[in-house]
Amino acid sequence: MLQIDGSHRFARGWDTHLVQRLHDCEAGKNAVLTGALPGFTSADTTDPHSETHFYAATPKPATQVKWSEEGLPLFSPREVEVNADKLSRPIETMAASSHFTFSHGNLAKVASHDPSFDNAFAWEELWMTYTYWKNGFTLYAPVDNHDPFAFYIQPGMNE
């Protein structure tokens, strides 16, 4: 099951790539792939055929960087710096990313988004992380040495 947030572009074969990465995770049916995706820029973001530049990188796992004034943990993507070239399978990560999650279909049955939330934008990733953890899921970042499979346009990248 794929969940995405915002404008994405996918590389050919993204689905088979993610299925293989999901099967590489030790948590089995309770594995969730997630991470901050590499970016892309496009001459015209409304035209999927416009000239596009994709940044070569793997998804980044999250790390807790500071605390909000309300006492909530704030997460930020980070590069894997030590032995990144030797990774051959996804690694565990501490937080979900709203850029994407990919999992077996049981995630939607057990830990789906709560439809009663009017606006979860500011704390969506924290809620996802807690809900998945509470229901026995393990988060993994597919940071292994493979070609990028998806790209995310972030606000301000085309300005």
Label each region the model flagged.
Residues 2-4, 8-113, 151-158:
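Conserved catalytic core of nucleotide-sugar-dependent glycosyltransferases
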